[in-house]
Regions:
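ATP/NTP phosphate-donor binding region
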Residues: 1-82
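Cofactor- and metal-binding active-site motifs of prokaryotic enzymes
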Residues: 64-72, 121-122, 129-131, 137
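Short, acidic/small-residue loops that bind anionic groups at enzyme active sites
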Residues: 104-127, 135-142
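Conserved anion/nucleotide-ligand pocket segment
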Residues: 134-169
């Protein structure tokens, strides 16, 4: 039995590429751990904006209303482009609600974007895969990236920038 071909990965990131911060799940109370993750992405040469309204944005236990969180995922940059990396700031609860709340605009754009996260973000990663889009990385959230061991950070960097990955030992 032949397996269907895997969808191609998004283009590798390059220094200067834009990163959009996404709060698709639970609310983020403080920026301290988020800032540490942002600093790592900036050290890789990526253009990461300020977290702005993502910190302290609450709607019950969620990081905003369903429409606000969907907007985090689908918003275009001021020049009309899409950021090549959507980096989720935290997991928790609530991202699966977005699958019923109008996440339909993303699949046509998602094949050229990476989506990084785990925990509750897994529902978004699986939804991308089910729609034939790769580039979903079940990896650190921005609030956990700085606490990852260096080898893990380096593997993520190599994956996103299209460099080879050595086998895990």
């Amino acid at each position: 039995m032949r397996r269907p071909p895997l969808p191609p990965l998004p283009p590798p990131l390059r220094q200067g590429d834009r990163v959009r911060l996404v709060a698709a799940s639970s609310a983020l109370e403080s920026a301290e751990r988020l800032e540490a993750g942002i600093a790592i992405l900036r050290s890789w040469g990526l253009d990461v904006g300020e977290p702005g309204p993502l910190v302290g944005r609450w709607w019950g236990y969620l990081a905003g209303t369903d429409s606000e969180r969907t907007e985090d995922l689908t918003r275009q940059e001021p020049d009309g482009s899409m950021a090549p990396l959507l980096a989720c700031v935290r997991g928790g609860w609530g991202s699966a609600r977005l699958l019923d709340a109008g996440w339909t605009g993303l699949p046509s754009l998602a094949s050229s974007q990476w989506l990084l996260g785990f925990s509750d973000v897994t529902s978004l990663l699986w939804s991308r895969w089910a729609r034939g889009c790769s580039g979903g990385v079940h990896g650190p959230l921005l609030t956990t990236l700085a606490s990852e061991p260096l080898w893990s950070q380096e593997r993520l960097h190599n994956l996103l920038f299209g460099r080879g990955l050595a086998p895990l030992e």
